[in-house]
Amino acid sequence: MATALSEEELDNEDYYSLLNVRREASSEELKAAYRRLCMLYHPDKHRDPELKSQAERLFNLVHQAYEVLSDPQTRAIYDIYGKRGLEMEGWEVVERKRTPAEIREEFERLQREREERRLQQRTNPKGTISVGVDATDLFDRYDEEYEDVSGSGFPQIEINKMHISQSIEAPLTATDTAILSGSLSTQNGNGGGSVNFALRRVTSAKGWGELEFGAGDLQGPLFGLKLFRNLTPRCFVTTNCALQFSSRGIRPGLTTVLARNLDKNTVGYLQWRWGIQSAMNTSIVRDTKTCHFTVALQLGIPHSFALISYQHKFQDDDQTRVKGSLKAGFFGTIVEYGAERKISRHSVLGAAVSIGVPQGVSLKVKLNRASQTYFFPIHLTDQLLPSAVFYATVGPLVVYLAVHRLIIRPYLRAQKEKELEKQRENTASDILQKKQEAEAAVRLMQESVRRIIEAEESRMGLIIVNAWYGKFVNDKSRKNEKVKVIDVTVPLQCLVKDSKLILTEASKAGLPGFYDPCVGEEKSLRVLYQFRGVLHQVMVPDSEALRIPKQSHRIDTDG
């Protein structure tokens, strides 16, 4: 699958790849690589005006790469932020001989200054749309009541509740943020809404505070205060005080949460809620790369319960997760299981089946699109019917597989190909320039390559017979895919030294005489070479290191 192309992919030269050295290369290795390329590209070695001009351009590029990597400060900047970091304004005021950590802090300071100038243009919109569906007529149908009713052959599926909420943030200064939010809800024909305004201030690196004002048609004015504070590096506390004004008087509320990191992956929470639905809750949450585990216990009025849940995270490109939970309390028991999966770059689709007493069976479908959430709880039955559980489990899976294979996958493939084509059009001039530079480099290498081949032949050493770089098509590829490779035999032979060829872990597109023939797509390097008179062949991914000759590359000619 093609990889996404960043804006800097063409502009950001890989200096390590150009010099063909490791990212951990010593100053001696850098100097040796620089001298070798200087001997190859020095303008004074070429009499032809065109070759001389091409050699001068390549020589300057090699010199620039060496200047950056040979200076500890510029090398540290380049290693962390790339070529763009070197072009950042403000480095001229940075003192020499700073450590990489100090350089990182300086760069972040310069970035903050730029971000503050664009602060007013930022918002962080978040929204939720929830649509409750009553589909109990599918399973809890009483046929004797519908015998004399016209049109009773079709189940009645209704939307019985809806909820919409939205919020935006408006940074006022580097420490102050205004938040505006609103919500609308309706259930069985009765509805209401509210609007809230909050002002948040970051008081220090250890805490922040927030004032909130709200009003609604069903509830009176609301005044709230939220505080957050890091007590220690491993412990923090949050407090939320609220005053709800109504015709019955003032209803105060207080919620306090104390949290502590038990280890690097585990956090313990202790929550006390007073006022509306008073309760004491304790929970332990463990979150690792492969799983998310929660256990909680609540004692409260009117609801007390125990909860245990587990989520397994698959290490795949689609970030698939499966989860299950058990909740038991005074109001019943609920078992819930489900899964979620990333269906596009910004969208995650999930479904869960909830089985409870006395709640019955429900199917919950959720779609997260960027910062927007769409939630559809579908109530199937008030009873524990095996048929409802079966259809709630199998139905979404079948629908997802069908939609993903017939609609989503073709759509994403078409979008990706369209994006790649647009990128190729936008970068056509840059690619053409790099192609011309690569061809010029190959012409400048011809004389050196001739001498290298003569030396290798005299000792029965390493001869590059053929080498190709780019996108190769195999039997599993789609029919409309085309081979997009370039011949890199001469550039690779030029890198042979003492019957050895060593390429570092970096994109080969940055090597002298190479260029990217298929921007944004996966590439490989295939080499057919001869060593000690025996043919060898190897193929490696673009960013994988290569060292030849190797016995494992030998072509078996006995069969």
UniProtKB/Swiss-Prot annotation:
Signal peptide: none annotated. The modification N-acetylalanine is found at A2. Keywords: Acetylation, Chaperone, Coiled coil, Membrane, Mitochondrion, Mitochondrion outer membrane, Phosphoprotein. Residues 415-457 form a coiled coil. GO terms for cellular component: MICOS complex; mitochondrial inner membrane; mitochondrion; nuclear speck; SAM complex. It is a peripheral membrane protein. The keyword Coiled coil applies. The modification Phosphoserine is found at S204. It is found in: Mitochondrion; Mitochondrion outer membrane. Its main location: mitochondrion. Residues 14-82 form the J domain. The keyword Acetylation applies. GO terms for biological process: cristae formation. Associates with the mitochondrial contact site and cristae organizing system (MICOS) complex, composed of at least MICOS10/MIC10, CHCHD3/MIC19, CHCHD6/MIC25, APOOL/MIC27, IMMT/MIC60, APOO/MIC23/MIC26 and QIL1/MIC13. This complex was also known under the names MINOS or MitOS complex. The MICOS complex associates with mitochondrial outer membrane proteins SAMM50, MTX1 and MTX2 (together described as components of the mitochondrial outer membrane sorting assembly machinery (SAM) complex) and DNAJC11, mitochondrial inner membrane protein TMEM11 and with HSPA9. Belongs to the DNAJC11 family. Following chemical mutagenesis predicted to give rise to a transcript subject to non-sense mediated deccay, mice exhibit an autosomal recessive neuromuscular disease and abnormal mitochondrial cristae morphology. Required for mitochondrial inner membrane organization. Seems to function through its association with the MICOS complex and the mitochondrial outer membrane sorting assembly machinery (SAM) complex. This is DnaJ homolog subfamily C member 11. The gene is Dnajc11.
